[in-house]
Amino acid sequence: MKFNATARSVQGSSASRRLRRAGRVPAIVYGGSAAPLNIELDHNEIYHALRKEEFHASILQMQLDGKEEAVLLRSVQWHAYKPQVLHVDFQRVDANQALHTKVPLHFINGENSPAVKLSSAIISHVVTELEITCLPAALPQYIEVDLGNLLGGGSVHLSDVKLPKGVTYVAHGSDANPVLASALVKGGGAAAADEGGDAAAAETPAA
């Protein structure tokens, strides 16, 4: 995706407020061999771009003063109660340097899984994005998680998903294989209790 930016020389909170009143958004781009650069964006353009998933998880082409530069969205500051973008951070992308970022998960075939069709289970998406590292050329817009074989009461782990070539999951702590989705069977607790009661009754000898 492409977006337009303009270099800005005036900094400070007062200057930022003036920009926002004029329908502009203060931003910064950093990283790589160049110094951090303060830029400004059109609010309407960046607001609508931020509503698209791909803007958050793909290499972006920034059009700045007649030149194009590859960047990655790093953070967005929103107004506390208004639909207003206050500030945006971008990172320059070096084709030969690995990225460390998050990508969304797309869950498919859940409605066709045995968990739903046979057990009427409720599927919970435990994790909705993964932290990964990869070279820019290998960065996926999303990672697909197929739930087609999920059974009632079962779960899908990261090890059940084939990551795109060149993509490595960044684990936190000891959880190298997190649960991505699980299937909760309705009334499972009650059914289990009934089964336990039946089993206990069966083991009790008749008087």
UniProtKB/Swiss-Prot annotation:
The keyword DNA damage does not apply. One of its GO terms (cellular component) is cytosolic large ribosomal subunit. Keywords: Ribonucleoprotein, Ribosomal protein, RNA-binding, rRNA-binding. Gene3D superfamilies: Ribosomal protein L25, beta domain, Ribosomal Protein L25, Chain P. It holds the Pfam family Ribosomal_L25p. GO terms for molecular function: 5S rRNA binding; structural constituent of ribosome. GO terms for biological process: translation. It comes from the Bacteria. InterPro entries: Rbsml_bL25/Gln-tRNA_synth_N, Ribosomal_bL25/Gln-tRNA_synth, Ribosomal_bL25_b-dom, Ribosomal_bL25_C, Ribosomal_bL25_long, Ribosomal_bL25_short, Ribosomal_L25_dom, Ribosomal_uL5_bac-type. The keyword Ribosomal protein applies. This is one of the proteins that binds to the 5S RNA in the ribosome where it forms part of the central protuberance. Belongs to the bacterial ribosomal protein bL25 family. CTC subfamily. NCBIfam families: bL25_bact_ctc, PRK05618.1-2, PRK05618.1-5, PRK05943.1. Part of the 50S ribosomal subunit; part of the 5S rRNA/L5/L18/L25 subcomplex. Contacts the 5S rRNA. Binds to the 5S rRNA independently of L5 and L18. PANTHER family: RIBOSOMAL PROTEIN L25/GLN-TRNA SYNTHETASE, ANTI-CODON-BINDING DOMAIN-CONTAINING PROTEIN, RIBOSOMAL PROTEIN L25_GLN-TRNA SYNTHETASE, ANTI-CODON-BINDING DOMAIN-CONTAINING PROTEIN. This is Large ribosomal subunit protein bL25. It comes from Bordetella petrii (strain ATCC BAA-461 / DSM 12804 / CCUG 43448). The gene is rplY.
